[in-house]
Amino acid sequence: MQKILIANRGEIAVRIIDSCRAMNIRSVAVYSDEDRNALHVRHADEAVYIGESAVEKSYLNGNSILNAALNCKADGIHPGYGFLSENAQFARDVAQAKLTWIGPSAESMESMASKIEARKLALEHQVPVVPGVVLAADAVPDLEKIGSLGLPLLLKASAGGGGIGMREIHKVEDLDSAIAQGRSQAQRQFGDGSLLIERLLSGARHVEVQVIGDLHSHLLHLHERDCSLQRRRQKLIEEAPAPGLSDDLRKQLQSAALRLAGAVDYHSVGTGGFLVQGDTFFLLEMNTRLQVE
């Protein structure tokens, strides 16, 4: 590739521009009204205006970004993280425009975007999952089956992420209202009212494994990190390597992350997230993007 458009701003855009420069690839920044004098704009070889300050009219405007890439004759688009980085349809649009999407395939993203689909894939590839019940958007909840998981429970929006769409359930009598509220919120915020109800693993550690794959089905892990120190399910500090894990458990986590990535023919950088309790672990999710940290 000779020229890459970076569909992002801030630190990540600057870092991608630096990498392009080191590889003798021309970089194209994009900007909105409020970003026209930002560092990433001044740092890039070229810069293109993509819309008004509201992100819906600029950094989340796939058509504007795609047109900018075509007009400046870029060879590919790097989404960075956030914004359109996990938008499978945008990735598909980029590929259909005969440009290179610098990220995982649309199919990989779609498979992992749904916690329910990710759970199904995990079970098929011997990756442990937390005991739970899948609840389709229009399904009548089997309260007896859900209650048999034991309390407390954690209700998750299937299409949610970043800690959004989660609620704890500590009383059986709260199940009905929690499910109704959870479905309503999930449908409103994510367009999908499907839920996943799992046993809440109190005190479990949050450990992630970074993976990277190429277009020839080669996959590697870049070891693990502990992300347990959080506020409102948002990570504050990460520590690598994760302390206090046995060598055997460390290898099991790394192997599970690679199996999950291989299940969707993953290429690009991604992250397998796991809950670790004692010597056991369970899949949490897979992030199909460059890790923010």
Task: Name every feature range the model reports, one short phrase each.
Residues 1-272, 276-293:
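N-terminal beta-alpha lobe that positions the nucleotide/phosphoryl donor
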